[in-house]
């Protein structure tokens, strides 16, 4: 895959449920602590190395931000780092929280 794909929250949720992909959240620490998808890994400059060690390059990665804009740059970056399949989640955490309020965790 040379380019990331955009995915809606329903499809992202299904991929998580079926363990077909991992989810990363690139929002700032305060926003992440105030609410994030239950299975999300908080991906920051400080946690990138650990994420890359723990997730093979053939593992599909879904990137979540606030509204689905910043995630596009991060998705492209992960492709450049060697990940084979990367998605940017349309609508970001705002859409996730609206559609799946029971699947939001709080705290870091």
UniProtKB/Swiss-Prot annotation:
Transferase that catalyzes the transfer of sulfur from thiosulfate to thiophilic acceptors such as cyanide or dithiols. May function in a CysM-independent thiosulfate assimilation pathway by catalyzing the conversion of thiosulfate to sulfite, which can then be used for L-cysteine biosynthesis. The relatively low affinity of GlpE for both thiosulfate and cyanide suggests that these compounds may not be physiological substrates. Thioredoxin 1 or related dithiol proteins could be the physiological sulfur acceptor. The keyword Chaperone does not apply. Keywords: Cytoplasm, Transferase. The active site is at 65 (cysteine persulfide intermediate). The keyword Ribosomal protein does not apply. InterPro entries: GlpE_sulfurtransferase, Rhodanese-like_dom, Rhodanese-like_dom_sf, Thiosulf_sulfurTrfase. The gene is glpE. GO terms for biological process: glycerol metabolic process; sulfur utilization. Homodimer. Monomeric in the crystal structure. Disruption phenotype: The deletion mutant displays no apparent growth phenotypes. The mutant is capable of growth on glucose, glycerol or acetate minimal media without supplementation. Deletion of the gene decreases total rhodanese activity by about 10%. It catalyses: thiosulfate + hydrogen cyanide = thiocyanate + sulfite + 2 H(+); thiosulfate + [thioredoxin]-dithiol = [thioredoxin]-disulfide + hydrogen sulfide + sulfite + 2 H(+). It is found in: Cytoplasm. This is Thiosulfate sulfurtransferase GlpE. Its main location: cytoplasm. It comes from Escherichia coli (strain K12). Gene3D superfamilies: Rhodanese-like domain (3.40.250.10). One of its GO terms (cellular component) is cytoplasm. HAMAP family: Thiosulf_sulfurtr. Coiled coil: none annotated. Belongs to the GlpE family. Overexpression of GlpE can complement the growth-defective phenotype of the thiosulfate-grown cysM deletion mutant. Induction: Expression is positively regulated by cyclic AMP-cAMP receptor protein (cAMP-CRP). Incubation with the cysteine-specific modifying reagent DTNB resulted in a greater-than-90% loss of activity. Does not exhibit anion-specific inhibition.
